[in-house]
Amino acid sequence: MPATPSLKVVHELPACTLCAGPLEDAVTIPCGHTFCRLCLPALSQMGAQSSGKILLCPLCQEEEQAETPMAPVPLGPLGETYCEEHGEKIYFFCENDAEFLCVFCREGPTHQAHTVGFLDEAIQPYRDRLRSRLEALSTERDEIEDVKCQEDQKLQVLLTQIESKKHQVETAFERLQQELEQQRCLLLARLRELEQQIWKERDEYITKVSEEVTRLGAQVKELEEKCQQPASELLQDVRVNQSRCEMKTFVSPEAISPDLVKKIRDFHRKILTLPEMMRMFSENLAHHLEIDSGVITLDPQTASRSLVLSEDRKSVRYTRQKKSLPDSPLRFDGLPAVLGFPGFSSGRHRWQVDLQLGDGGGCTVGVAGEGVRRKGEMGLSAEDGVWAVIISHQQCWASTSPGTDLPLSEIPRGVRVALDYEAGQVTLHNAQTQEPIFTFTASFSGKVFPFFAVWKKGSCLTLKG
């Protein structure tokens, strides 16, 4: 909208156009112009053709009879608008120039051909548009408030669910802790029971041996005394003495009974499996809850030209037609392999892959060291910096040197990998059956990366999560 220089807002009484003083006790003459009542005598002149007086407006030169009633002008509140050029109150609005006009502005040449109307009439379309916009804004505001209310309700539902899940987690782990504590107490009680049986059988053994030692001691003493007797006395009871001198075979009792030894041996075997059971439980729990250090993706800079990666870098498949890719010291060119990202130099990490084996093809899953060979023929063993399992339709084997055939109950269609850097372990499980596949032990130095390879058309590998 163009500027409106003809408009000013009056913050004090407007000035009279005759005396230039404050327009106090103002009156409006018939032509519509306003002056101070004290200035009216200056407007009076004798009419040329009448005996009466006339009022001559100095602004529009219109003549009126002096007897014509003059309307007092109630001065509006501070802030009324007046024409800056003529000092007159604003009554009109020019649609073409979007300007406020007084009487003189309306009659001037500038706005003769323009669409000019009274303020109340001109403002109505604008008021209608404003009301329409106001209704639209009110509707939009109401809709936003409704959406906000709905979202707040959803948020409250989610918060309630979270609070419920927190309680469930606390309850589950408290129950688990109680069960573990109960099992711990049972194991310790069983160990104490075995310990008491050992001490009991030891006491029984000592008692038997002590009794036999005492009996033999008494017999030795008796025989020593017999040896000191004269021949006549000794020969009197020769048959009795000879009977006493005969050696009786002493069956030495066992300190621990074979039955107790078997119980201890069986319990010892159970205890030996406890750490492995706890480790597997921890891994299964972490995997089930998807507690991991981050998302694993495939590194396109390392991918062989025989591999096609998905846009999200979560899936890779084999292709017979090698892709045209820039050469890089990081890229595998002898094996259809690719590394995962990121690499790890500490901590415990887990990831899972789903396998799709093509006809006569297969997949390799595991980890590889940062310095693994990328160019030309490469081996798959710990000496080559690779700890992985090779899976095909017919068999599965570990990349040891020499390779280790793995007689699994079924060929995995998904593999879960658990890396414990500090412990130097890489453990692989069947993701569907939880059956252990193989555990590598190593002494890592530098970063290790998730390692994957696929071969033959139709073979595909997809990272989960």
UniProtKB/Swiss-Prot annotation:
EC nos: 2.3.2.27
Induction: By TNF-alpha.
Any single GO BP term: negative regulation of non-canonical NF-kappaB signal transduction
The keyword Kinase is assigned to this record: no
Zinc finger (RING-type): 16-61
Pfam families the record matches: PRY, SPRY, zf-B_box, zf-C3HC4
Quaternary structure annotation from Swiss-Prot or TrEMBL: Interacts with paxillin/PXN; this interaction recruits TRIM15 to focal adhesions. Interacts with TRIM8; this interaction prevents TRIM8 cytoplasmic translocation.
Protein name as it appears in the record: E3 ubiquitin-protein ligase TRIM15
Organism per entry: Homo sapiens
Gene name tied to this protein: TRIM15
